[in-house]
């Protein structure tokens, strides 16, 4: 017998999108920097390496935690951590551990280009990250180099995928 779904008693209190659907997912950018220069996202000829921003302009971990806690209070249950490349954010596993400890946040995911994942996959998993999305445009090494602005290698991403699998993702 199939279980009968029960409506969320607080659904009427939730913020809604333009189509009236409750907002339960939050996408949060934790850094405005990337180690690649993909032509569709941040071409080297138009985006400086520092993006015109410095570390002082980023939200602190305390500010991020307070912000996410507020969204959880109004019904957000899923968090996707992004950035240009979120793995460039120093001490990211520490931030994820803080967010994973928030009551009511059921899922934390991260989108990455995967090039820095080999060194961080285990720490991210142990911190409480549930899921990963790795953006991979091609499995051709030369095509990959061209798409990343020659700032990344396919081998780095593949090592990151292996490390993620070994870490339990």
Regions found by a protein language model. Name each.
Residues 1-24:
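Auxiliary Fe-S-binding modules of radical SAM enzymes
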Residues 7-9, 45, 88:
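Intrinsically disordered, low-complexity segments enriched in proline/serine/threonine
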Residues 11, 49-52, 80, 145:
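Short amphipathic alpha-helical segments at helix-loop
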Residues 19-61:
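Canonical Radical SAM [4Fe-4S] cluster-binding loop centered on the CxxxCxxC motif
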Residues 32, 84-85:
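Acidic-residue sensor for enzyme active/binding pockets
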Residues 61-81, 88-169:
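Radical SAM/AdoMet-radical enzyme domain recognition
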């Amino acid at each position: 017998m199939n279980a009968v779904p029960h409506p969320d008693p607080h659904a009427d209190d939730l913020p809604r999108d333009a189509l009236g659907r409750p907002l339960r997912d939050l996408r949060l950018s934790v850094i405005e920097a990337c180690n690649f220069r993909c032509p569709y996202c941040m071409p080297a000829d138009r985006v400086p390496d520092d993006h015109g921003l410095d570390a002082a302009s980023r939200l602190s971990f305390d500010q991020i935690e307070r912000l996410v806690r507020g969204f959880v209070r109004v019904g957000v249950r899923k968090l996707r951590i992004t950035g240009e490349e979120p793995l460039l954010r120093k001490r990211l596993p520490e931030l994820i551990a803080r967010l994973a400890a928030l009551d009511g946040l059921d899922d934390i995911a991260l989108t990455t280009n995967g090039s820095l994942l080999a060194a961080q996959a285990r720490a991210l998993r142990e911190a409480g990250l549930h899921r990963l999305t790795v953006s991979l445009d091609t499995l051709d090494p030369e095509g990959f180099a061209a798409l990343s602005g020659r700032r990344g290698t396919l081998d780095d991403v593949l090592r990151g995928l292996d490390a993620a699998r070994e870490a339990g993702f």
